[in-house]
Swiss-Prot record:
InterPro entries: Wilms_tumour_N, Znf_C2H2_sf, Znf_C2H2_type. This is Wilms tumor protein homolog. GO terms for cellular component: cytoplasm; nuclear speck. A zinc finger (C2H2-type) spans 290-314, 320-344, 350-372, 378-402. It comes from Xenopus tropicalis. The keyword Nucleotide-binding does not apply. Transcription factor required for development of the vascular component of the pronephric kidney, the glomus; may repress tubule-specific gene expression in the portion of the pronephros fated to form the glomus. Recognizes and binds to the DNA sequence 5'-GCG(T/G)GGGCG-3'. Inhibits Wnt-signaling during embryonic development. SUPFAM superfamilies: beta-beta-alpha zinc fingers (SSF57667). The record marks K388, E394 as: Important for interaction with target DNA. There is a cross-link at K56, K159 (Glycyl lysine isopeptide (Lys-Gly) (interchain with G-Cter in SUMO)). GO terms for molecular function: double-stranded methylated DNA binding; hemi-methylated DNA-binding; RNA binding; sequence-specific DNA binding; zinc ion binding. Residues 334-348, 360-368 are annotated as: Important for interaction with target DNA. PROSITE patterns: ZINC_FINGER_C2H2_1, ZINC_FINGER_C2H2_2. It comes from the Eukaryota.
Length: 413
């Protein structure tokens, strides 16, 4: 299966034919292409949504979305203000909408993108596809589900939850929520207070980072959902009371990740989501079991907290701010903030045992100590040069000298 990316049309499960001979089946395209999948007017409240969210269509995928190896679960917790409004987007049969469904005068961001049929309102057939659930608190009740439904989400504080069961606080970072893929006019009257996002993606661990652009905003309707994620369980369970009806939303959200998988423990970076954890059963006893999954970065760490701090280099998150007057500098790590604040206070807690000189940073003391011991751990690697230095910056300057001399020699020749 590799790391191919499915067309969202192939990811939606097949549904039975309804009265009126309408059908919601979505075929796979016959050739690979990039295609927009949104249908939103350019005006508020969607003006902040990125207009360039695309999903690669690959004909190499089998159109059957029910492959066992794809049934892994992944949840992304959203918190933030719900800005979607009923009637903001259009729905209809796939292709052009029927005249009764079309809204006159409404501009489409992507004129050629598909419409979503309202067949989900009446669909009663069992849908046997593994889903990934995404919840957000559009109202103060996080992950709320109406009382007449089976609870799909339980209340959670917004903390990072690593796949092995640890719960460690992770600084909140704002991202633009990926735009919904399809949308319809309004939810049912009985479900107006229950918004959620559903990631309709069967996948394996190889293509996991592709998924966030495939989010859909939904409300829960009393219909059948054959395989649903229940309370962050490790496998899918049948739930005959809850099936989502599409609904549109947008805005800025605070994103958290929580991996829940069948057979593997694997969370990889997805666009717009904080780089998370990669940890498989074969790595459980390794010295550094936590590996960064940001594309191109495979650094490993002994502790989960160290990986979380490292991840902020990729996200740019700086949750620690200096509280001194007129200083608004921010840092990604608490020790960096503490070290910075010593500039304001003048505190120098590190003292040389030989000469009693004090320093505000331990690395400065370590470098200074070499002046007493004569240690020179930094060696020049230039051919035929054996010089050593006590400080790394001295080695850099020395190396630059070699480079300048080489340049002059080349120009002379």
């Amino acid at each position: 299966m590799g790391s191919d990316v499915r067309d969202m049309n192939a990811l939606l499960p097949p549904v039975s034919t309804l009265s009126g001979n309408s059908s919601c089946s979505m075929p796979v395209s016959s050739s690979g292409q990039w295609a927009p999948v949104l249908d939103f007017p350019p005006g508020a409240p969607y003006s902040s949504l990125p207009p360039h969210s695309f999903i690669k269509q690959e004909p190499t995928w089998n159109p059957d979305p029910h492959e066992d190896q794809c049934l892994s679960a992944f949840t992304v917790h959203f918190s933030g203000q719900f800005t979607g409004t009923a009637g903001a987007c259009r729905y209809g049969a796939f292709g052009a909408p029927t005249p009764s469904q079309a809204t006159t005068g409404q501009a489409r961001m992507f004129p050629n993108s598909p419409y979503l049929s309202n067949c989900l309102d009446n669909q009663q057939g069992m849908r046997n596809q593994g889903y990934s659930a995404v919840a957000f608190d559009g109202t103060p009740s996080y992950g709320h589900t109406p009382s007449h439904h089976t609870a799909q989400f339980t209340n959670h504080s917004f903390k990072h939850e690593d796949p092995m069961g640890q719960q460690t606080s992770l600084g909140e970072q704002q991202y633009s929520v990926p735009p919904p893929v399809y949308g319809c006019h309004t939810p049912t009257d009985s479900c107006t207070g229950s918004q959620a996002l559903l990631l309709r993606t069967p996948y394996n661990s190889d293509n996991l980072y592709q998924m966030t652009s495939q989010l859909e905003c939904m409300t829960w309707n009393q219909m059948n959902l054959g395989s649903s994620l229940k309370s962050h369980g490790t496998s899918y369970e049948n739930d005959s009371h809850s099936t989502p009806m599409l609904y549109s939303c947008g805005g800025q959200y605070r994103i958290h990740t929580h991996g829940v998988f069948r057979g593997i423990q694997d969370v990889r970076r997805v666009p717009g989501v904080t780089p998370a954890i990669v940890r498989s059963s074969t790595e459980a006893n390794e010295k550094r079991p936590f590996m960064c999954a940001y594309p191109g970065c495979n650094k490993r760490y002994f502790k989960l907290s160290h990986l979380q701090m490292h991840s902020r280099k990729h996200t740019g998150e700086k949750p620690y701010q200096c509280d001194f007057k007129d200083c608004e500098r921010r840092f990604s790590r608490s020790d960096q903030l503490k070290r910075h604040q010593r500039r304001h206070t003048g505190i120098k807690p590190f003292q040389c045992k030989t000469c009693q000189r004090k320093f505000s940073r331990s690395d400065h003391l370590k470098t200074h100590t070499r002046t007493h011991t004569g240690e020179k751990p930094f060696s020049c690697r230039w051919p035929s040069c054996q010089k050593k230095f006590a400080r790394s910056d001295e080695l850099v300057r020395h190396h630059n000298m070699h480079q300048r001399n080489m340049t002059k020699l080349q120009l002379a020749l």
